């Protein structure tokens, strides 16, 4: 399955950029991967850019109000999408103000990383690592212990 990762901006902090690059490289062993960086001056512009970037792919928005997954549950979700014929999933991290209500209501799924507020750069690393971990679980590999 193809994964399309959409972020508002790029990781600015060195640790986050290096973490993103490492897990992006690892994730490419399991999925075709597309990364799109979008921008906008307002929340509405950012959300519109995310919507355009996702195209027709089901859109999973990272949002604090969203469903929380354990790593095995995320793996099962990805597997179910693939078995169900979904060829591509788009995952999006919004800007500092999050996503608009309109984009949220049109999303395939809202995914919450937890109750903590994370810096944008760290959320990017958590996203790509979580997808990598879920992929190794699906492949029966020992990364997740």
UniProtKB/Swiss-Prot annotation:
Q: Name one GO molecular function term.
A: rRNA (pseudouridine-N3-)-methyltransferase activity
Intracellular or extracellular location(s): Cytoplasm
Binding, S-adenosyl-L-methionine? 62, 94, 113-118
Which of the seven top EC classes does this enzyme belong to? transferase
Give the Pfam families listed for this entry. SPOUT_MTase
Q: Which GO terms describe its cellular component?
A: cytoplasm
Q: Which UniProt keywords apply?
A: Cytoplasm, Methyltransferase, rRNA processing, S-adenosyl-L-methionine, Transferase
Q: Tell me the SUPFAM superfamilies matching this sequence.
A: alpha/beta knot (SSF75217)
What's the stated role of this polypeptide?
Answer: Specifically methylates the pseudouridine at position 1915 (m3Psi1915) in 23S rRNA.
Q: How does it assemble?
A: Homodimer.
HAMAP family given in the database record: 23SrRNA_methyltr_H (MF_00658)
Q: Which family does it belong to?
A: Belongs to the RNA methyltransferase RlmH family.
Q: What is this protein called?
A: Ribosomal RNA large subunit methyltransferase H
**Source organism per UniProt:** Deinococcus deserti (strain DSM 17065 / CIP 109153 / LMG 22923 / VCD115)
């Amino acid at each position: 399955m193809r994964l399309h990762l959409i972020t508002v901006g790029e990781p600015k902090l060195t640790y986050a950029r290096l973490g993103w690059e490492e897990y992006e490289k690892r994730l490419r062993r399991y999925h075709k991967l597309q990364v799109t960086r979008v921008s906008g001056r307002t929340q509405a512009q950012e959300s519109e850019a995310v919507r355009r970037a996702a195209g027709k792919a089901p859109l999973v928005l990272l949002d604090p109000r969203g469903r929380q997954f354990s790593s095995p549950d995320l793996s099962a979700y990805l597997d179910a999408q693939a078995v169900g014929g979904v060829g591509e999933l788009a995952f999006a991290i919004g800007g500092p103000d999050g996503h608009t209500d309109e984009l949220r209501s049109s999303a395939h799924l809202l995914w919450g990383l937890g109750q903590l507020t994370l810096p944008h750069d760290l959320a990017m690393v958590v996203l790509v690592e979580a997808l990598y971990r879920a992929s190794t679980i699906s492949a029966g590999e020992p990364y997740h212990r």
